[in-house]
Amino acid sequence: MSLNQPQPTVQEIFKNYTPPVPAYSVVTNLLAEVPAIYLTGVDSVILTNIECGNRKKRRQKTLSRKRKVAVKDCRGLYHQQWQGIPARIELFVDNIVNGIPLWILRIPLICNLIFAEVLFHEVGHHIHYAKVPEHREREGVANYWGKKLRK
C-alpha cells in the first residue's frame, strides 16, 4: 500500500462469539497484499458474526446469481458507497470457519487461503462497482477478481 492512500481499517465486532483463529491479523495481512488502487474508497473491513446483527438484518435477503440468498447464510457482504457513507466490507467469521475442523484452521497457510477467498471476492465487488465496471454478471466478475488477487 502506498503512503498517500490509507489502508481500510479492520474492526472486530462480535456478540457472544470468539473466533477460533486470529481473524484480525489474517485479514490485515491479506489487505496489505492488495494493490492500493483497488482499495481506494473502501473505508473499513468489519469482522463480525451473524448474531451481531439485529433480527431484521438476519432475516434480510441479498441477490446472488439472480437468486435470493439469506444474509445469515453469507460469508461476506460488500456495501457500496451510498449517500456519503463510504464503502465497506463485512466478513462473517462464524460462517467462514463453519464446518472446517479446528486443526485445519490452525495451519496458517490454509487459514489465509480460506479468508482470502471471501475477502478478495468482496474486494472484487468493490473493483467491479468503483474501478472497472463491466457488463457481466456481478458474482462472475467478483469471482474473477477474487482469483486474480489470490495469485
Describe the role of every protein-language-model region.
Residues M1-E90, N98-P108:
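A metal-dependent hydrolase signature that marks the N-terminal structural subdomain at the beginning
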Residues V26-E33, L119-E122, W145-L149:
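Amphipathic alpha-helical segments that form well-ordered structural scaffolds
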Residues N49, K131-P133:
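Acidic carboxylate-rich catalytic motifs and surrounding loops in phosphoryl-/glycosyl-chemistry enzymes
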Residues I96-V118, P133-E134:
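Short pre-active-site segment immediately N-terminal to the catalytic Zn-binding motif
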Residues E117-A130, A142:
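Active-site recognition of the HExxH zinc-binding catalytic motif
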Residues H135-K151:
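Post-HExxH zinc-binding segment in Zn-dependent metallohydrolases
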Residues V93:
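Pocket-edge structural micro-motifs
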